[in-house]
Regions:
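Short, extreme N-terminal segment that most often corresponds to the first beta-strand
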Residues: 1-25
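Ser/Thr- (and often Asn-) enriched beta-sheet segments in non-cytosolic proteins
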Residues: 2-8, 51-53, 94-96
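Generic structural motif
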Residues: 10-12, 55-59, 100
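Extended Gly/Ser/Thr-rich low-complexity repeat segments
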Residues: 17-25, 60-83
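Short, flexible N-terminal segments of the mature chain
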Residues: 17-40
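Surface-exposed polar/charged interaction patches
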Residues: 29-33, 65-68, 86, 90, ...
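Short, intrinsically disordered low-complexity segments
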Residues: 32-75
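Amphipathic alpha-helical binding modules
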Residues: 75-102
Length: 102
């Protein structure tokens, strides 16, 4: 199963650019092609909700490379969510992130 995260924001157009750029950088760091997919948004009450899916190959590299060493959380899925959230935040993104499926 591929990790799936739900991202939410009030500034979808701006955040989409930041998230894509950050994930492309992470993809390059992992030396993986097609490591993520951003799904179409759903708009509700001024918020945009969109899913971010990681490939199993990218997940494997993140897990085995030690990138998540300082990620806090109870269990692997929460640590991965926190790692991705902090990575996006470090690149200027202000999206909210939650586990949708893992």
């Amino acid at each position: 199963m591929k990790p799936l995260f739900q991202l939410s924001t009030r500034k979808y157009d701006d955040e989409l650019v930041l998230v894509k750029k950050a994930m492309e950088e992470l993809e390059n760091n992992c030396k993986v092609k097609n490591g993520f997919e951003i799904k179409e948004p759903t708009l509700k009450a001024g918020w945009a909700f969109f899913n971010l899916e990681l490939s199993t190959e990218m997940l494997s590299v993140i897990e085995s490379s030690g990138m998540m060493i300082n990620a806090q959380g109870f269990g692997f899925s929460e640590q991965l969510k926190n790692f991705i959230g902090h990575f996006l935040e470090s690149k200027g993104s202000e999206v909210r992130i939650k586990n949708a499926n893992y």
